[in-house]
Regions:
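Surface-exposed alpha-helical segments enriched in charged/polar residues
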Residues: 3-4, 35-38, 112
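A cross-family acyltransferase "interaction/gating" segment
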Residues: 23-98, 105-106
Length: 118
């Protein structure tokens, strides 16, 4: 279904880490998430989300151990307002890389670099 949406020119959003983390480090990207882009020959748009002026609020925004979405939302509503920077990075064309694994590695590298430059 994701590949068909991409072929139809529609957007699909995914978080390639495939789960929640403590916000201290970028986790590994699951290559299977990019399979639909390869199948549909659709470009991938990496996006980095940086919380805080120097990406220094990542751990505050991240899910606490065992925390579910509603708990995270309620906790964040009690936090001070935080700046978020949304960085749209260089799109990745599937034909220019070695399949889904190459896309995953390139996307992760771009996002990691963007967060380090904050």
């Amino acid at each position: 279904e994701m590949a068909q949406r991409l072929r139809d020119g529609r957007a699909v959003a995914a978080f390639p880490e495939g789960g929640t983390r403590d916000g201290e480090a970028l986790g590994p990207f699951h290559a299977r998430i990019f399979a639909a882009a390869v199948e549909a020959a659709a470009p991938v748009q990496p996006v980095a989300l940086c919380y805080g002026p120097q990406c220094n609020a990542q751990a505050v925004i991240a899910f606490a151990p065992g925390e579910h979405f509603v708990g995270n939302l309620l906790r964040l509503l009690g936090e001070p307002v935080r700046q978020v920077r949304v960085c749209f990075l260089t799109p990745i064309e599937p034909d220019a890389h070695s399949g889904r694994r190459g896309i995953a590695q390139t996307a992760r590298s771009q996002i990691e670099q963007a967060m380090a430059q904050a």
